[in-house]
Amino acid sequence: MLVWLAEYLVRYETAFNAISYITVRANLALLTALFISLWIGPKVIKRLQILKFGQEVRNDGPESHFAKKGTPTMGGVMILFSIGVSTLLWANLANPYIWVCLFVLFGYGAIGFVDDFRKITRKNTDGLIARWKYFWMSVVALVAILWLYWLGHDTDATRLVIPFFKDIMPQLGLFYIVLSYFVIVGTGNAVNLTDGLDGLAIMPTALVAGAFALIAWATGNVNFAEYLHIPYIKYSSEVVVFCTAIVGASLGFLWFNTYPAQVFMGDVGSLALGGALGVVAILVRQEFLLVIMGGVFVVEALSVILQVGSYKLRKQRIFRMAPIHHHFELKGWPEPRVIIRFWIISLMLVLMGLVTLKLR
């Protein structure tokens, strides 16, 4: 939005030309989202307390979690608000990719909001019926994917980029829709499953979003895209602003979500952030890198799949409890140790993912 204002004001003062640079707007988007999150955080927490929007806890979970019951939840609304305002202020709103990102973010956020609200009103951990939850997640994902397919049909925007192989980039055609569906829905659920400890999901989210900001910048620059042997995607550079807004909002939320948490993001935050990371990975054609950099999310989701599958087939559990972060808690690891170690692993995976861009 401010890009358009700057284009007008530059006629009178050339300093406003700085806002046309993506790097300037990306940094301003990060700072804006961070400050908004820090500013509204206490107000949101107080309002959630007044409304008695408290966290419900599983009866079969670790005993240390019983003390978390009643902690304000649905704090993800402050994340979404911060990202939304910052993106609308600093992104070029003529770019269609920005609207796709915001559509998925708020679409999944709305689904998560309903899920959280039902848990609170019913005073248990049961939210939306699973089939309806997946139905609406699928609807949002497919609308976004078809939108993107229409924008980039038969261009580099629908090619598959495979790490380590610079000359293998097959045109996906209609399979682009199938792959993109699993990426968005899968990432949304994976981040949702990871959000079980104070700050566990939000830091990896910030790290992955920060890495995707760098990748989006390179993908949207003809020279860097050619140098790294990755597709040049016409509209992708503006996605940098959206990614840095996620980083800023995530760090601002972490201020209140760090152990012991003053607020939880709830499904309204985790589903939205997961869906956002998924759609960004599709936009910059780096679905495989999302698996690497978001390895913590992948392992958390796989632990649940393996646990459920093993119990149904063999009546035996692989882990003491799933997702896997609860397994380590039940082994005696203090919650902060689990969180920090998962953060370290996430940082390592993000750095590994960035390195693969050059190893081709």
Swiss-Prot record:
Keyword line: Cell cycle, Cell division, Cell inner membrane, Cell membrane, Cell shape, Cell wall biogenesis/degradation, Magnesium, Membrane, Metal-binding, Peptidoglycan synthesis, Transferase, Transmembrane, Transmembrane helix
The EC number(s) this enzyme carries: 2.7.8.13
Domain of life: Bacteria
Cofactor: Mg(2+)
GO molecular function: metal ion binding; phospho-N-acetylmuramoyl-pentapeptide-transferase activity; UDP-N-acetylmuramoyl-L-alanyl-D-glutamyl-meso-2,6-diaminopimelyl-D-alanyl-D-alanine:undecaprenyl-phosphate transferase activity
Family from the record: Belongs to the glycosyltransferase 4 family. MraY subfamily.
Subcellular location: Cell inner membrane
Function in brief: Catalyzes the initial step of the lipid cycle reactions in the biosynthesis of the cell wall peptidoglycan: transfers peptidoglycan precursor phospho-MurNAc-pentapeptide from UDP-MurNAc-pentapeptide onto the lipid carrier undecaprenyl phosphate, yielding undecaprenyl-pyrophosphoryl-MurNAc-pentapeptide, known as lipid I.
CDD domains assigned to the protein according to its UniProt record, in alphabetical order: GT_MraY
Pathway: Cell wall biogenesis; peptidoglycan biosynthesis
Main location: membrane
PROSITE patterns according to UniProt: MRAY_1, MRAY_2
UniProt name for this protein: Phospho-N-acetylmuramoyl-pentapeptide-transferase
BP GO annotations: cell division; cell wall macromolecule biosynthetic process; cell wall organization; peptidoglycan biosynthetic process; regulation of cell shape
GO cellular component: plasma membrane
Cited HAMAP family: MraY
Source organism: Haemophilus influenzae (strain ATCC 51907 / DSM 11121 / KW20 / Rd)
Gene: mraY
Reaction(s) catalysed by this chain's protein: UDP-N-acetyl-alpha-D-muramoyl-L-alanyl-gamma-D-glutamyl-meso-2,6-diaminopimeloyl-D-alanyl-D-alanine + di-trans,octa-cis-undecaprenyl phosphate = di-trans,octa-cis-undecaprenyl diphospho-N-acetyl-alpha-D-muramoyl-L-alanyl-D-glutamyl-meso-2,6-diaminopimeloyl-D-alanyl-D-alanine + UMP
Taxonomic classification: Bacteria, Pseudomonadati, Pseudomonadota, Gammaproteobacteria, Pasteurellales
